[in-house]
Amino acid sequence: MLLLLHLLPAVLPASALGSCTGAGADRQLVLAKVRARVLEHLSPPAMQEPQKDVRRVHRRDVLEEVEVPPEEQEDTSQVILFPSTDVPCEPTQPDKLLEEEGIFTYLFQPSAHALSRTLTSAQLWFYSGPSAAPNHSAPAVLTLSPQGRVPVVATASRTPEHWTVFDFGPDALPQLAQPLFVLLVRCPGCPCLADGDKMPFLVATTRAKAAGRARRSAVPWSPAALSLLQRPSEDVAAHTNCRRASLNISFEELGWDNWIVHPSSFVFHYCHGNCAEGHGLSHRLGVQLCCAALPGTMRSLRVRTTSDGGYSFKYETVPNILAQDCTCV
């Protein structure tokens, strides 16, 4: 036990020991630590011209979303899903029936990450062309069921760029949370385009499943050591000034809003405060206590980045950056 107390500063990660520099950390110091922590794991793109031959997602429109409360931002992510099948623009049968015209079929296969979370909202973006024929019905979304094709509850709206956006209702979300599902768009008079810029796509917003707190990673030492860390110090005053602080940070403030596009901001949790010198065991051993994150309780931050000005996106993770529990160790 005594040896463990000596070794704790050596085995704790540097991010957990950041508060040992003192309790007077101002905003600029915290921002500098966040910048350094992010750059340890992510690399900003070099300035370059956008690649014109890459399928472009309409970044201006897709990234317009409802503001998420700061306390929920770190648990919310957005997924852009393209169909896993090509768009057939020719009839599969020469004697295709007239009522089959204007039916577009798309197969979607969500990722394992998306399936592990709760779907909170979804939109289907479908390019319906510059003008809709007045003698045709409005576009609609259907899905397949044992009874055949059934309508999906969705509200349709058009954008100035000639896209029809289907906002799915809550009753439709369980159908979109399957490992494999088919969506059909009925749009008589709409063009059938296989061009990548006009490919339909699904925008899904998800959050962590509401099963309580996120599961913590295993502590890499014995339960006895963890018990030692969780126990208050012999000097109660050593813990009175150690707490978890929070700071709302925007990526625009960090100068990265053209690189990290979602979330636009996040709540940075960190350990803050001093640990007074006690007169117990730690004082006799000459060990300085630090206000730091309890090992095994740090959480990661998931972000969506672009390296070509919004033509493509990818998800990246900054591990162990958000403190959940703080203590004097």
Curated annotation (Swiss-Prot):
By its UniProt entry, which Gene3D superfamilies does this protein fall under? Cystine-knot cytokines
Q: Name one GO molecular function term.
A: hormone activity
Record-linked PROSITE patterns = TGF_BETA_1, TGF_BETA_2
**GO CC annotation terms, alphabetical:** extracellular space
Q: Which pairs of Cys residues are joined through disulfide bonds in the record?
A: 242-291, 271-326, 275-328
Name its cellular compartments. Secreted
Q: Which InterPro entries match?
A: Cystine-knot_cytokine, Inhibin_asu, TGF-b_C, TGF-beta-rel, TGFb_CS
Pfam families to which the protein is assigned, alphabetical = TGF_beta
Prodomain residues: 17-60, 61-216
Q: Where is this site: Cleavage?
A: 60-61, 216-217
This protein's name: Inhibin alpha chain
According to its UniProt entry, the function of this protein is described as: Inhibins and activins inhibit and activate, respectively, the secretion of follitropin by the pituitary gland. Inhibins/activins are involved in regulating a number of diverse functions such as hypothalamic and pituitary hormone secretion, gonadal hormone secretion, germ cell development and maturation, erythroid differentiation, insulin secretion, nerve cell survival, embryonic axial development or bone growth, depending on their subunit composition. Inhibins appear to oppose the functions of activins.
* Family, per entry: Belongs to the TGF-beta family.
Going by the UniProt record, its keywords in alphabetical order are: Cleavage on pair of basic residues, Disulfide bond, Glycoprotein, Growth factor, Hormone, Secreted, Signal
Give the source's domain of life in one word.
Answer: Eukaryota
Q: Is this entry keyworded Disulfide bond?
A: yes
Range of residues in the leader sequence = 1-16
Tell me how the protein is altered or processed after translation: Proteolytic processing yields a number of bioactive forms, consisting either solely of the mature alpha chain, of the most N-terminal propeptide linked through a disulfide bond to the mature alpha chain, or of the entire proprotein.
Looking up SMART domains in the UniProt record yields:
TGFB
Report residues carrying sugar chains.
135, 248
Quaternary data: Dimeric, linked by one or more disulfide bonds. Inhibin A is a dimer of alpha and beta-A. Inhibin B is a dimer of alpha and beta-B.
Q: Please name the gene that encodes this protein.
A: INHA
Does this entry carry the keyword Signal?
yes
